[in-house]
Structures are given as structure tokens and as C-alpha cells.
Amino acid sequence: MVELNRRTFLSGSVAAGAVALFGTEAAHAAGAVKLPAKWDETADVVIVGSGFAGLAAAIEAKKAGASVVVLEKMATVGGNSIINGGILTATGCPQQKKHGIKDSPELLAHDMLVAGLYLNNPEKVKLVADNALSNYEWTVNELGVEYNPDAIGQEGGHSVPRYVFTKNGSGSGIVSKEVEKLEKLGVKVRTRTYVKHVLRDDTGRVLGLEVLEGYRFPKTGTGKTKFIRAKKAVILCYGGFSRDVEYRTMQDPKLTAALDSTNQPGATSELWRETSRIGCAQVQNDWIQCTPWNNPKEKGMGIGWTFAQSGAAEYGLWVATDGKRFVNELANRKVRADAIMVLKGEGKSAVAICTKPNLKAFEEARPGMLQKLLEQQIIKEYNEP
């Protein structure tokens, strides 16, 4: 993780002080929200969202000496982070060295730029790539996260194997450790707290938030109004909007209600709309990630992706229902997802195939998962005559 001093911390905040705007006059014209006569609470830093990013920001802010408030609209912490696959890119990690894999931050940055069609912000790409190892080390040394010590995997779009994954195979292996660390520092995430408005002064400077405490998702307007002042920064880590069909189809019309989402139910657009109202510079909202490895028989993320990606994509084949291979299984996820969309338009489906001998690495990395997938009939086993 990048070492943040107070100045860097504040200058890097999404909505700290003079927020990144398309122009404060234009944002102001979009409709001002009246400031409260009195603030109910004041903190140095107020963080919205309790996924990986929000919790990490809270930990570092607290360690830097700030008073911290963390808000989460759902009843439980973690957002999408807690239900993801627990995978982390860790260029230069011990697992890579154990397997003799040559890698570098420069190669990671190159892969990111290629996968992003060079639409990425090069400075941010470099920041991520240069700190991939320190990020991994922070989760291990600071939080005590446990990763599989022997396994290293190769995601689509990456030139070499460079991802590690938590021992429990879930993002909860990271989130739970972040929550533990935060509580040791004296900060508890405030769940069921809905952010209604970002509050600013006449110059456009962010002063704090209007929230609803005791909010009951998805019941609009539930909860008690409270005003929280942020003396130094409001940090927005509220995640995506893929569960909001109306909003996502405004961005990408092909992503209709016919398509399910792997996101948790609270991945909706309220704060995307609110930050747009105040003029925050939102970039590439219509570049919505579609995952190519999920099983349509499962709801949400499920577990079928483990076979499709960590099994068949790395050690087998993806074919269409006509038996023809249709894509490079280790292409980036957009290339693969787009190829599946084409198949869908042709009335075909994608099938992930792998021979059992080739699944040895998968079984070693995720003990018991293959049997679980078979028992739940998420995958099928065929024996040659």
C-alpha cells in the first residue's frame, strides 16, 4: 500500500475540499442543497462505503491521526468486495518466485494499458502497478490476510500468472481482516446509513453529508435525517451500479434486465446521480464490465466461475455449443465477454471444458471445489467410452 502523508491523503481524496468539478458554477446551477443550521456530528474524515477501498482508506486515515466515520447503507459491511473471489494481483510476490515466474511492474502496467485500450489514465496505471507488491504486503503484514502460499494464477489479459487468492476463496478473507483492524483502532462501520446529499458551501467546497440513519434497503426515505460535518475530507468509495437496471441501461442500452448481475443488491446508482449533480468528474461510466465466466444457472456470483476461469480458461478450452473454439481463453474479460455476447446473438452458448488430469492444479489450489461443483450439478462429468 502507498504510504500516505497528510498532504497526499487530502489531495488524493475524491471529494475533499475543492472537489474535482466540471466547473463549480455549472455544478451549482444544477441545484444547491440547503446547509443545516447545525451539524449533528463532526469528524476529520467521512468515508462512504465499506468495501476494500473504503476500509483501507479508513485504516490509513485513522493511523494518520484523523477522526474517522465510515458509512454503509446496507445492513452488513463489505459490499461487492466481501462476495468476490478473493483474488489479488501481486506482482513480485513469494508465490511467483516459488514458481520461477518473471514479472515486473512495467509488464503489469503494459497489460493494464492494452486491456484498457489505452483509455486508462497512465499515471494511475503506474501507481497501481508500482504498488501491487506493497499492496499485497500490506494485506499480509498489516491485516494478517492469509493467501494460498503455493498457488499462483493467470487471469485473462495478463501476460504471466500473477494473482494470489485468499485461503477461504472469497473477498471476505480480506474484508473481515480490515474490519478487525479498524475496530482495534476504535472505528466501527455504521451500517444502514444512507447518504442522501453531499453538502457544499457557496464556493463548491464539500463540507459534509446529509444521511439517513436506520435506513432499510430498499425502502426509499426510511431512517432519521442526520448531518455529518467533514473537516478534512469526504472520501467516496460507494462502488458500482450494476443492480440498477434503469441507470445501467442509460449508460449501455444492451445491458437490459434480461442480464443478471454478480453484484450484491445494494449496487445501485443513488450516489452516482448525487455526485453527478454536484459536478464530480465521472469518467467512462458507460464502460461497464461484463464477466465472461459466470454460470447462468446460478444467481449472482455463484461458484461456477471457479471452474470456468481457474479451471477451463487456464487449463482447458471454451467452445460454443457447435463445438467450435470461439475465443482466446486468456484474453481480457471484455474481449471474452463481447465474444459471448456475439454467440448469444447467434442463439448459441459458451461451454467451458477441461480434462480431469489438467485440473490437478485447480484441485490443489481450491481443495474440495471440484467435488462441490459436481454435487451441485453446476458442472457435469463425462467419461470416455
PLM regions with names:
Residues 1-16:
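N-terminal secretory signal peptides and thylakoid transit peptides that target proteins
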Residues 39-51:
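Beta1/beta-strand and adjacent pyrophosphate-binding region of the FAD-binding site
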Residues 54:
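N-terminal Rossmann-fold NAD(P) dinucleotide-binding loop
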Residues 64-81:
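Glycine-rich FAD pyrophosphate-binding loop
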Residues 90-128:
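Glycine-rich active-site loop/strand segments that organize a redox cofactor
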Residues 130-225, 231, 245-247, 295-296:
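Conserved redox-cofactor binding core of oxidoreductases
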Residues 216-223, 229-299:
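Glycine-rich loop(s) and the adjacent beta-strand/alpha-helix scaffold that form part
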Residues 272-274, 281-385:
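An anion/pyrophosphate-binding glycine-rich loop and adjacent beta-alpha core
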